[in-house]
Amino acid sequence: MSNESKCPFSGHNSKPQVTVGGGTANLHWWPNQLRVDLLNQHSERSNPLGKDFNYRQEFKKLDYYALKADIKNVLTDSQDWWPADWGNYTGLFIRLAWHAAGTYRMGDGRGGAGRGQQRFAPLNSWPDNASLDKARRLLWPVKQKYGQKISWADLFILAGNIALESSGFRTFGFGAGREDVWEPDNDVNWGDEKEWLAHRNSEALAGSNLAATEMGLIYVNPEGPQASGDPRSAAPFIRATFGNMAMDDEEIVALIAGGHTLGKTHGAAPADHVQADPEGAPIEQMGFGWANSYGTGVGKDAITSGLEVIWSQTPTQWSNYFFENLFKYEWVQERSPAGAIQWVAADAEAIIPDPFDPSIKRKPTMLTTDLTLRFDPEFEKISRRFLNDPQAFANAFARAWFKLTHRDMGPKARYLGPEVPTEDLIWQDPLPAASATPSSASIADAKAKIVALGLPAGELVSLAWASASTFRGGDKRGGANGARIALSPQREWEVNKKAVETLTKIEELKASTQLSLADLIVLAGNVGVEQAAQAAGFNITVPFAPGRVDALQSQTDVESFQLLLGLADGFRNWKKQGVNTPAEVLLIDKAQQLTLTAPELTALIGGLRVLGTNWDGSQHGVFTQQVGVLSTDFFTNLLDMSNVWAPVDSTSEVFEGKDRKSGTVKFTATRNDLVFGSNSILRALAEVYAQADGKEKFVQDFVAAWTKVMNLDRFDLA
């Protein structure tokens, strides 16, 4: 054997010699490792636009109607590399927008169209998103022309709207404001399945945050549960998946029928002709996936879902043909050319136009889940009403489509553009219009009155935290603006019991000040932080931005807001009974929803503990003899090797810290507390504040993180 053949760097070995980030990863050895890394997603280091880029300002420079005209032109500019059905990409762009938005789930607010995630794995390569790589590439010349004035996230949804409008449909409106990110959202739990299209039961779906019946689908299997071809058994799965998106029966019927009024599915041949998805495709395919070896691989030979269905006689024009055909004909099960289960109108004439040969006509076809709208009793009632009242159907679809594509955007204050509807919708969590901004004198007066109450700093801080910490970065819901802690359901939450006692005292001040209750609550928290910092020897002023308003109960959907409670708030050492997920995992989840970094999480926990803000007044994690002082005692005592820790029972939820020599119990703690000494990353951060020179930095960092949380929902400050 030659020396060259033996050399590991000669280039002749089949295995790569160097792989950055390769090799056996930490998660292989420790699969339950805490995902602190999720708090460092979407940092400035991954953003090519820099920290000073302001999408809202950039969008205002956009010639909006010129953009719309250019997108409309794309619809009928058929490309040889992906020929348009009937010379029109309407159906493709509707599907693009639908599938961009359809990953949203109201349970945790994650998913949805708001960040342009369909550009990245796994969504760019989900089986249900086959061929949408072509739709995104069709839009590239438009994106290239308008640059950063329009985000990909907004472009996906706007393209769907324009496709509907080009068909003669009148949409409810459009709000821009979705800002792109530059890497996948790794915090989203898409499910535990390890195979594409692995099935989930409807009971599991109803109790989860998952938005699809199978791994890699947007909603449900169009062939019925586990490709059973049974329309009736599909109903509970449809309700569960759409219900997890906050859609009711009428919205479900409208969305399915409206989405299937235009376009077609593609299943010219069996799936064994289809090659790798975009993430797994060879480099020379340049981000395209699902190469098709059947015939030309495109146009009449295209394979996407494997189904070959056209619902309407006018597949590029809005109509009521979906319902007319659904109820007019008797449907017989058949197999598509790809072998998928679908249905054909056995007693119909050939009235459906072929997408590429005008001399050919087909019989109407439907999906198994389309027939569910006829054979499920409740869906059938709604469907017949829409059959007999096309305008009611059009109106219901317009509103449901708007909700689908905007549900994850949060309050209407975030919407941009000339087509934002004026009507306030309950799912937007509407707020009253703001009045005049309070003067500096009125703020100072209110601050003095809060101080005069003589309440402990921890109580003031606890109230403000309870109000602000409902915010979810995924769908921009919750937060302190609106003072909804004073309304149902938040006022009745167990975790808010002590905070509401303080709230009652703050409410009594409102009439004598010029501030809203929402502003008073945050100002009270700031007062508490300032008092605690002063007690630690630091005179600081916590930044305060007035202008919050107070929501009405009529503006608050109780059922929807109940979801903001979540499973735990580790910042207050609260965890819902019966939840078996480790507390520290839920703490990371909460911190990620609050858009906190790992250092911000660490500073906040350390400060909240020494201020005594546990939801029930317990001493867990209160590692100090001077409660109410913004000290670094939490960190110094946590890392003190004279203490030894042990669980108090077999649940390992609560722990005692004893003096290593005497055995005297000094402290108690939860997993939320000890993780800052146990986890190597969080311990490294805790050490920064436990050091002799960490006191002032801790106060500064706590105040900065505190102010961030108080202002998370202040979109008017952007």
Curated annotation (Swiss-Prot):
Disulfide cysteine pairs (residue numbers): none
First-tier enzyme category under EC: oxidoreductase
Cofactor annotation: heme b
Pfam families: peroxidase
PTM characteristics: Formation of the three residue Trp-Tyr-Met cross-link is important for the catalase, but not the peroxidase activity of the enzyme.
Keywords: Heme, Hydrogen peroxide, Iron, Metal-binding, Oxidoreductase, Peroxidase
GO term, biological process aspect, one: hydrogen peroxide catabolic process
Cofactor details (free text): Binds 1 heme b (iron(II)-protoporphyrin IX) group per dimer.
Record EC number: 1.11.1.21
Covalent cross-link Tryptophyl-tyrosyl-methioninium (Tyr-Met) (with W-98) as placed by the record, residue numbers: Y219-M245
A GO MF label: metal ion binding
Annotated positions binding heme b: H260
Site note Transition state stabilizer, residues: R95
Catalytic-site annotation from UniProt: H99
Cross-link entry Tryptophyl-tyrosyl-methioninium (Trp-Tyr) (with M-245), positions: W98-Y219
Catalytic activity: H2O2 + AH2 = A + 2 H2O; 2 H2O2 = O2 + 2 H2O
GO CC annotations, alphabetized: cytosol
Protein purpose: Bifunctional enzyme with both catalase and broad-spectrum peroxidase activity.
Family statement: Belongs to the peroxidase family. Peroxidase/catalase subfamily.
Subunit structure, as described in the record: Homodimer or homotetramer.
Protein name (record): Catalase-peroxidase
Organism: Acinetobacter baumannii (strain AYE)
Lineage: Bacteria, Pseudomonadati, Pseudomonadota, Gammaproteobacteria, Moraxellales
